[in-house]
Amino acid sequence: MTTYFNYPSKELQDELREIAQKIVAPGKGILAADESGPTMGKRLQDIGVENTEDNRRAYRQLLFSTDPKLAENISGVILFHETLYQKADDGTPFAEILKKKGIILGIKVDKGVVPLFGSEDEVTTQGLDDLAARCAQYKKDGCDFAKWRCVLKIGKNTPSYQSILENANVLARYASICQSQRIVPIVEPEVLPDGDHDLDRAQKVTETVLAAVYKALSDHHVYLEGTLLKPNMVTAGQSAKKNTPEEIALATVQALRRTVPAAVTGVTFLSGGQSEEEATVNLSAINNVPLIRPWALTFSYGRALQASVLRAWAGKKENIAAGQNELLKRAKANGDAAQGKYVAGSAGAGSGSLFVANHAY
């Protein structure tokens, strides 16, 4: 086993590290707007709007043309391939609109999950084959970071060793390819909230998964300062008794401290089907845990930033301003939470669960 390898050049290290640091600047986080066509269809169906390309474009136009002060709390937006190349009504590309606001462009690069044969309903994520070429093109088209999601399930016998190892290795290979093309990889190993497991089991599984992920990243010589982690918060299963925000926060920070190297620039939590209010309250609690936290701890939320926006808009032109106002409110609430300053209930957020069983993007 050789221990000789090359780190990226100093120029590449600097570029990757600076992008990662900008994304997790104090009080800022990520808007995940990378829902695929079918997933966006479900969101639109909930408000009685047909899933057409133009309706998807109209909704994303609402998000991206929100007042420039959105950039006070949103540092980056994750786009779906279709969205990166769409334009506003006046012909301005969405990418340009976001860049003018000083918002960094990200892109979802995985191609969804496929079954692991012989496992108990476990999956791995596909999309590595042409990833280098796609990343090179996305960088040319203005993207500076990428996202790749792997999914693990907690059951009596899962996640299995096979699934933990395979998904860790896929994430490491993805991260390595991204960095070779000057793109910061967001590493997302999501332990799903489905099930009736308790907080202790969720914490142990999360620790085991993260330990495997960082071993794989080390094996692939990934430059950690030029990466971000997008994990689940540690919560009991969806059908188990709920814990307090303080209990969730402590379990989450303990799991991260035990497994995530201090070199990692930041952690941008996924909301994982929590209600808007829960996702914000829990993030604020995480930033108040009385333990040393060497990384920025912020958000990369989809549903927890958009549910109120969709409801306010309801597909109607005359409601665009109302929808944008909701987005500003949610972004500000989560920006405060990323600094441990959110006051529960102060943003009038929805408290309805946004959980989707066996969630696929």
From Swiss-Prot:
It is an enzyme of class 4 (lyase). Belongs to the class I fructose-bisphosphate aldolase family. Homotetramer. Pathway: Carbohydrate degradation; glycolysis; D-glyceraldehyde 3-phosphate and glycerone phosphate from D-glucose: step 4/4. The active site is at 188 (proton acceptor), 230 (schiff-base intermediate with dihydroxyacetone-p). It catalyses: beta-D-fructose 1,6-bisphosphate = D-glyceraldehyde 3-phosphate + dihydroxyacetone phosphate. Enzyme of the glycolytic pathway. Glycolysis is essential in glial cells but not in neurons; neurons rely on the citric acid cycle for their energy needs, and on lactate and alanine secreted into the hemolymph by glial cells to fuel it. May take part in developmental stage-specific or tissue -specific sugar-phosphate metabolisms. Protein acts on two substrates fructose 1,6-bisphosphate and fructose 1-phosphate (like other class I aldolases). InterPro entries: Aldolase_I_AS, Aldolase_TIM, FBA_I. CDD domains: FBP_aldolase_I_a. Thermostability of the isozymes, calculated as the temperature causing half maximal stability, is 42-43 degrees Celsius for isozymes alpha and beta and 45 degrees Celsius for isozyme gamma. This is Fructose-bisphosphate aldolase. Disulfide bonds: none annotated. Pfam families: Glycolytic. Disruption phenotype: RNAi-mediated knockdown is lethal. Glial-specific RNAi-mediated knockdown is semi-lethal. Neuronal-specific RNAi-mediated knockdown is viable with no defects. Its EC number is 4.1.2.13. GO terms for cellular component: cytosol; M band; Z disc.
